Design a protein with these regions (language model features):
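ATP-dependent adenylation/nucleotidyltransferase module used to activate substrates
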Residues: 1-128
């Protein structure tokens, strides 16, 4: 859950469908205050538990710097991959069978391909 419209709407719909979702938040420590307030408001309003993973800033900053130096267009690939992994980690930890994601639909499907190896390669070549 990011606190933006897409993930907030997904929580609302999941509750409407009679599901008992767990909101999972990947905190890269760059949250806008409105996002933090929205997460609290949505989870409280719909009675949804929240599980948050906070990044190790030293590692995350090293990776982000490498992406800046690489000049690649997938600047947030590291965050996207980390978010997917955090959702899978939460699902395993709490024995959750299904993962629901809300997306804005802004990025065209198939416009990017990246995986953990891509992030690791950029980090190895360009990080401190």
């Amino acid at each position: 859950m990011s606190g933006d419209t897409d993930s907030s709407y997904m929580i609302m719909k999941a509750v409407d469908w009679g599901l008992r979702p767990l909101a999972v938040h990947y905190d890269n420590t760059w949250n806008a205050s409105t996002a933090t307030m929205n997460i609290a408001r949505v989870t409280k309003t719909f009675g949804v538990d929240l599980w948050t993973h906070v990044v190790n800033n030293e590692v995350a900053d090293d990776i982000k710097k490498a992406f800046l130096l690489a000049g690649v267009r997938e600047f947030d690939a590291d965050t996207d991959i980390a978010l997917a992994q955090v959702m899978r980690t939460a699902a395993a930890k709490f024995s959750i069978k299904y993962i629901l994601e809300g997306h804005s639909g802004i990025s065209p499907i198939g416009s990017n391909y990246f995986d953990g190896g891509y992030v690791e390669d950029i980090q190895k070549k360009l990080a401190n």
